[in-house]
Design a protein with these regions (language model features):
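Interhelical loop and adjacent transmembrane-helix boundary motif
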Residues: 170-190
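Residue-level recognition of membrane-helix boundary sites in multi-pass small-molecule transporters
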Residues: 91, 120, 131-133, 145, ...
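Transmembrane alpha-helices
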Residues: 131-162
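Primarily residues marking transmembrane-helix entry/exit sites
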Residues: 6-10, 186-187
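Short membrane-interfacial helix/loop motifs at transmembrane-helix boundaries
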Residues: 1-8, 168
Length: 190
């Protein structure tokens, strides 16, 4: 059906797409998970209310989520070049993917943790659990299913973003789709 050259190109594109998607999701969770936990705990009905911290994080997350990815990708080119040394390719694409994914993840985590029954948290407090114990042994455990669903949604979102990155040389399947499917109109590769 396809020549060996096309198959090699597609396999390389799949590899680059997986590299960008998984790498950005992992680093996105490194940033977004603590942000989401902090937002939940510092909310007015959280276990350690702090309006100032919550408002700052809420504004950061809202701004981060409201910027369209393609615009963010272009805006972050200088930062990407400073961090990676170039602003194109699959490794360089991870930087804007992480910056875009982290606020999304933070909101997903916040939403998941807010679903935890307040009675369970109150029971842990009454038994003398510390804030860290409530977070790690009650909230994260009780929200486990919702958090896993959040990971799958995040992976799908980041995968879509990585395809968009191909429009400006981000590599992966998005790059192949633009170069061969759109510019050359080779429908068989699409």
């Amino acid at each position: 059906m396809f020549s060996q050259e096309v198959m090699d190109m597609l396999i390389k594109g799949i590899g680059e797409t997986l590299y960008m998607t998984l790498g950005a999701t992992i680093f996105g969770y490194v940033l977004g998970l603590p942000m989401g936990i902090l937002m939940t705990t510092t909310a007015k009905d959280g276990i350690r209310p702090n309006a100032g911290v919550y408002k700052v994080l809420d504004v950061i997350v809202n701004i981060g989520r409201s910027i369209p990815f393609l615009i963010l990708l272009i805006l972050l080119m200088p930062l990407t070049k400073a961090i990676v040394g170039k602003s194109y390719g699959s490794t360089a694409t991870i930087v804007p993917l992480v910056i875009s994914a982290a606020p999304f993840i933070a909101r997903m985590v916040e939403s998941s943790l807010n679903e935890v029954d307040a009675g369970v948290i109150e029971a842990a407090k009454s038994m003398g659990a510390s804030t860290m114990q409530i977070i790690t042994k009650v909230m994260l455990v009780e929200a486990r299913t919702s958090l896993v669903v959040g990971v799958t949604i995040t992976l799908g979102t980041v995968l879509g973003y990585s395809a968009m990155a191909g429009t400006i040389g981000g590599g992966g399947l998005g790059d192949i789709a633009i170069r061969y499917g759109y510019y050359r109109y080779q429908a068989d590769i699409m």
